[in-house]
UniProtKB/Swiss-Prot annotation:
Organism per entry: Dictyostelium discoideum
Name recorded for this polypeptide: Probable ATP-dependent RNA helicase ddx47
Stretches with biased composition (Basic and acidic residues): 512-524
One GO BP annotation of this record: rRNA processing
PANTHER family attached to this UniProt entry: ATP-DEPENDENT RNA HELICASE RHLE-RELATED, RNA HELICASE
PROSITE patterns, alphabetized: DEAD_ATP_HELICASE (PS00039), HELICASE_ATP_BIND_1 (PS51192), HELICASE_CTER (PS51194), Q_MOTIF (PS51195)
Domain notes: The Q motif is unique to and characteristic of the DEAD box family of RNA helicases and controls ATP binding and hydrolysis.
Keyword check for Membrane: no
Homology family: Belongs to the DEAD box helicase family. DDX47/RRP3 subfamily.
Catalytic activity: ATP + H2O = ADP + phosphate + H(+)
Motif (Q motif): 119-147
Length: 546
């Protein structure tokens, strides 16, 4: 006959104190030997937490801490024979310890928030005139990247800034530059480089907005605009010059009287992109003609780890301000994927847009022709879509962007020209029609939504040919994405209409002298990968159109 014993087992609360639970166990004779593990979880946790505090473990190292705890537990139970009940107890204790660590880290983050609760632009040392401009723009409190970088910048240090997209990076370098300009005004005070035309205009807009109270003058130097009008603007000695490397170098070589020998500040926004082969020659030539006695700021959402590349920018004792891991997306972003058959890719795109109608959406494609064709196809289906890509002249690109910002068109079909730096806070949805070829581009693409604390959604369409690239992205992000729910039967209801819209778009493109053979439409990602591989083998670096 079985004997029922009432045993008391200590468990761990989130605050670290032990409570007693009553558990009922059944045995044939005497109770089995109780695992010594049950008496030690609290001591183990305390020991590891102490190590955590000593090492000042950061948020991204939480997993390492948890692994350390598990190793400690394994040491405790080594050479010990555990029965089924003891194994269950061990699992429960591991869960309790993990919960304890999570609660501890949560408390630490809450304490940090309280610590920075009273931090203001004034306490950071920002000039009252600039604070007034920030308040008018709704910048009432400094963001994390601004809190960390502005004090160092005002002390005259070079800065490498790494922060998530939409976290206020632009203002983090604009504010200190304007403050130093206010203290010692001069023409051609600052040069800011950006990899795309749209980002250059956005940086200039930020300088104009925050510098409105001090009368700052800016000049934008990008391709697609008449260089003569830019030369006339340079002749007026603007305080800040913002441009793409190619056009800045063009004016250095061809505009009489223009030089950068007097600049005090040199900024590279989206610095990792500017260090790539596409801009290497131009950036190196610009670095040769600017003074060594200057302050340099490098900012990006993803940053190269190659020290040699950073050294080319001639940084002097730089401060690294990092408020995000190398490849990190914001917590307010819902990231999903949709695995689809290659031949039904367009049909699934139409289904997603129909299901999530009413959202301001950016669709990313891998080629310019694909961007134009998909926009045409979606318009034929009744969606308000407009393209933006490197094949369009600057006037048309800005017109597309303005229509999208104003809400006249709700869908922007873009190449990676729109992936970096564009700040449109109201974007609700990002769709990766073509899987990005690397994790950096994924981070920048999905960073167009969920900006400045807002929520957003990103959906990546994955075909059978994209699985390896997609898995690589998940591996680097250290995150498994959820699947976007849908039924194929429901999706295929759109098939006939989508095929007809695609046929009409193809004919329209032929009329505009687009070569369909160079596009392959849905196969863009495959084709572009093969082309890129051949380019690497031949070591021929053709510049992308930005």
């Amino acid at each position: 006959m079985a004997i029922t014993d009432i045993k008391k087992k200590p468990t761990l609360k989130s605050n670290g104190s032990a409570v007693v639970k009553k558990t009922t166990t059944t045995s044939i004779a005497a109770a089995p030997k109780k695992s010594t593990l049950t008496e030690k979880p609290k001591q183990i946790v305390k020991k590891v937490i102490k190590k955590q505090e000593e090492k000042e473990v950061k948020e991204e190292e939480e997993e390492e801490v948890k692994e350390e705890i598990k190793k400690e537990i394994k040491k405790e139970i080594k050479n010990e024979e555990l029965d089924e009940d003891s194994l269950l107890e061990k699992e429960e204790e591991e869960k309790e310890i993990e919960e304890f660590i999570n609660n501890t880290n949560q408390k630490k983050s809450e304490e940090e928030e309280k610590k920075y609760e009273n931090v203001t632009f004034e306490s950071l040392g920002v000039h009252p005139q600039i604070i007034d401009a920030c308040n008018k723009l709704g910048f009432n409190k400094p963001k994390e990247i601004q809190r960390e970088s502005i004090p160092w910048a005002l002390k005259g240090r070079d800065i490498i800034g790494l922060a998530q997209t939409g976290s206020g990076k632009t203002a983090a370098f604009v504010i200190p530059v304007l403050q130093k300009l206010l203290e010692a005004p001069q023409g051609l005070f600052c040069l800011a480089l950006a990899p795309t035309r749209e980002l250059a205009y956005q940086i200039a807009d930020q300088f104009n907005a925050i510098g409105s109270t001090i009368g700052v003058k800016t000049c934008v130097l990008v391709g697609g605009i008449d260089s003569m009008s830019q030369s006339l603007a340079l002749a007026k000695k603007p305080h800040v010059v913002v441009g793409s490397p190619g056009r800045v170098l063009h004016h250095l070589e061809h505009t009489k009287g223009f030089n950068l020998r007097s600049i005090k500040y040199f900024i590279m926004d989206e610095a990792d992109r500017l260090f790539s082969a596409d801009f290497e020659e131009e950036v190196n030539n610009i670095l040769k003609v600017i003074p060594k006695e200057r302050n340099t700021y490098l900012f990006s959402a993803t940053m190269t780890s190659k020290v040699a590349k950073l050294q080319r920018a001639s940084l002097v004792n730089p401060v690294k301000v990092q408020v995000a891991s190398k490849y990190q997306t914001v917590d307010t972003l819902l990231q999903q994927y949709l695995f689809v058959p290659f031949k039904y890719k367009d049909c699934y795109l139409a289904y997603i847009l129909n299901e999530l109608a009413g959202n301001l959406t950016i669709i990313f494609t891998s080629t310019c022709a694909s961007s134009t064709k998909i926009a045409m196809m979606l318009r034929n289906l009744g969606f308000g879509a407009i393209p933006i890509n490197g094949d369009m002249d600057q006037g048309k690109r800005l017109a597309s962007l303005n229509k999208f910002k104003q809400g006249t068109k709700s869908i922007l079909v873009a190449t990676d020209v729109a992936a970096r730096g564009l700040d449109i806070p109201s974007v609700d949805l990002v769709i990766n029609y073509d899987v990005p070829t690397n994790s950096k581009e994924y981070v920048h693409r999905v960073g167009r939504t969920a900006r400045a604390g807002n929520s957003g959604r990103a959906i990546t369409i994955v075909t059978q040919y994209d699985v390896e690239m997609y898995q690589r992205i998940e591996f680097v992000l250290k995150k498994k994405l959820d699947s976007f729910p849908c039924q194929e039967e429901t999706v295929l209801i759109f098939l006939e209409r989508v095929q007809e819209a695609h046929r009409i778009a193809t004919n329209e493109l032929k009329d505009k002298n687009y070569s369909s053979s160079s596009d392959r439409h849905s196969g863009d990602s495959e084709g572009s990968i093969d082309i890129n591989k051949r380019k690497v083998i031949k070591k021929v670096h053709k510049k992308k159109k930005y």
